Every structure is written in C-alpha cells, then in structure tokens.
Amino acid sequence: MRDRRPAFRRTALACAWLFSSAAFAAASPDAQPEAPEADLAIHAQPATQWTGVWTRQNLLGDIGGLRPWLGKYGVTFSLQETSEYLANLRGGLKRGGTYDGLTTAAVTVDTQKAFGLPGGTFNASALQIHGRNLSQYNLGTLNTASGIEAQDTTRLWELWYQQSFLDQRVDVKIGQQSLDQEFIVSQYAATFVNTMFGWPALPSYDLPNGGPAYPLSALGVRVRGRITPSLTALAGVFDGDPLGNNPNNLSGTNFNLHNGTLFIGELQYALNQPADGQMDMGPSNALPGTYKIGVWYHNGRFADQQTDNTGLSLANPASSGVARAHHGDYSFYAVADQMVWRPDPTGAKSLGVFARVMAAPGDRNLVSVAANAGVVLKAPFEGRDNDSVGLALTYVKIGSHARALDEDFASFTDGPYGVRTSETTLEATYQYQVTPWWQLQADAQYTFNAGAGQNPSDPTQPLRNTFVVGLRTNITF
C-alpha cells in the first residue's frame, strides 16, 4: 500500500469514511478467552502498532496518545461501523436495494491494571442501528440476508463483569449478555453475510423474540471451565425473554427476570491447538479444528403450531383460536470447524470447512431443523494473505405442525394456500482486506423456495426464488 500515489490515498480514505464498518461480532471482548478455541481465521497480527494510516490496526491510530494512556489503566475503547448495500435482483416481495448500517462502541476494563484485582474484566457495549432491512421489505425469506438487520435504534447491548479463578481454568460472567458471542458459534461461518451463519435460524424463530442474541441481550450467569487442555465446558442461565415485559424496549435497559428461564450448555473440543499455558512449539503440519455439542432448554410455555386447546385445528372455523400450550422447549446442536488443507504451516493460505446442525420439536416450533455448511479459503491469491473467499449453504425446515396447519387452511378454504416446507440459501462471498482497519466484502445470495413456499404478505401466493447481491464495508476506528 505504500506505493500508492497521494491522490489515490485521498480518494480511498474518503471512500472509507463514506462506507465505514467493522464486523461487530469479531470485536467482542470474549475473544480474549481463557478457552482453548483457536482463531481459525488465522488473521495476521503485527507485533507493533505502526503509525502509518495505511498500516496501523485502527483508522484513528492511538488518537493522539489517548489509547496507550487508557491502556495503562486497563481501559480499552473500540468503535466500529458496518455499512452495506444489498439489492434483490429477482423474486421475493419486490426488486430493489436498501442500505443498512451498524455502529458498535465498546469499553473493556482489565481490573488488574485498573485497581489491582487480578482476573477481572468489565465490559459495556452499545449499538446504533440504522438503515432499512432488505429481507423485511424486499425478500420475505426465512434465511434473512444480513446479520446486521434489526430495528433502527440506539441501544445498550452487553453489560457484564467476568472473573477468572484457579489460574484461569474457570471463569464466571454475570450481567447482560448476548449468547451469540459465545454459544453455537462457528468461526468459519462468521465469514458470511446471511444472518443464519451467525445466530442460527432455529433459535431465531423458536425462542421468545429470537432469544438473547444480536441486537438483544439478557440478564444471566455464564460459567466456563477448562476440563482438560483441549476440552472446555460452558453453561449459562439467562432470562427467557430478552424484551421482557416491554416489547418496545428499544433502549436495551429493561433488565428483566420475569419471563421464564433459558438454560444452555456446550462442550468444546479443540483439536491440534496449544492450550493456555502450554509452550507453542512453532509451526506444525497438524491442522487445527474445533468441535462443539450443546443443548438449550426454556421452561416457558409455547403454543402448538397446529392444534387449539380443544384439540381442533387452528384452521377449523369452529376452533377456539387459542393454541394448545406446551410446557418447555428445547434443542440439541452440533458445530464443527476444521482446517483441511494448508500447504505451508508458516503461511497464511489454508482451506477450512464448517458444519452446524440443530433440531427441536416440530409441534411447538416454527422451525424444527436448521443447518448450514460451507468452505472458506484464506489467502486465495499471492500477496492477499488477509483475504478470504467462501461458499456456503444454509437450510431451514418448517416444523411438522406448522406445515400441517398450512395444509388444514388449504383444506378448509378450498382454495390455493401456500404450504411451507423448507428454504435453502446459497451464498458466495469475498472479503478484501484493503488495510488492517478497512475491509470490503462482495456478496451474492440465491434463495430456493423463498418463504419456504409461502408469501408472508399473501399466504395464498408463493414467492419466486430471490437473488441478492451487495457490498459490505467494515472499518475499525
């Protein structure tokens, strides 16, 4: 980048300000973990903070000495922006494009440096969400096109304190937390833009208000323990509804404990990765991977997707209209991230694959099965060590009772009625690292059987398959 002419530098810098962004999930303080999971993204990290605008890690550098001064007292401040323009070229609800944006600010305090308490971390973060959601207005798909889509607002995101014990083998986090920062995470899947490669479709549609995941969070306690150098266990107890008693809780400050309880547990196995405290023996031909299994349980009451409280179909004109209630809901899941090829153990080029699958009861849930899988190539071209190119598929299956209800409506109305079955989205993406602080991402998504076979605006009509293209830009300030 040093060979660029000044005019080009000025132009590129102006573009950066116009299209600024940074992947919000990647900046979570949870990425400093005591857990053994490796960063399979293998991003190159310089040993020093260079001062040149094109080579430093943050656009604003040390902000005139402010960052290092705060760092002496254990305070880390981050500001990031994600901006994107996505357009639907065919099918769905209508053609056209929309702009979406997300600003994330976070403050982390290391209590050892701040006031001498070892092993403590305090975190507070906030979101400013702006723009218009393509999926809601143009697509009508279940696999929503962008992981930053949400209602426009400025809100508190996370507010928690974490304390480690036993030489960092155990840590406890308490406070307002977003589960998608630690649970059900696939690092390779995070390369992609579609929402379902982040927080999956199944909890998004089956838990109250989508569960405590971006842009929401919930009060709770999470415990993490390193059982062996390669095996880590996580368990958490959280409020069951992140919006609580106030569905218009746009500020994120309605701290609620009155809407059921969500329990979640996960085991993580790290393959071919040095654990904390172990000596790094240098480059190895062994290929790293991470494997996870987990379960969540919610003790609230969940409406049957087909039957009312008298045993009739909800589509029956004689139905009471009150769905039969089920006590509790649950899901099992598995996640795998595995590097499968790396020609040079000292180089950046590598090929990784991922898979994630979840299942839940079909009687009380709109989505009974959700899965995604894909492949990611790091450093695809010579001299592009921090670029990534990926191809992935995400799949949603409608629960048996929701599907049966559609069939009942078709029978009782004696006319056309879309029966929802499943929906699949194929995504291809390329991340181009312009500078350490600026990334451009070109993206294309094609959705098969959009809306799972039903138009959400008119259930008697189907949706045509959608084709979405767009550009996302990420900036770390």
Regions found by a protein language model. Give the residues of each.
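Residues on the lipid-exposed face of transmembrane beta-strands in outer-membrane beta-barrel proteins
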Residues: 79, 105-111, 158-163, 221-225, ...
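Outer membrane beta-barrel
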Residues: 96-242, 365-372, 381-405
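N-terminal periplasmic/intermembrane-space "pro-region" immediately following the signal or transit peptide
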Residues: 2-3, 15-17, 21-82, 88, ...
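Short loop/turn motifs that connect adjacent beta-strands in outer-membrane beta-barrel proteins
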Residues: 61-77, 110-122, 166-169, 230, ...
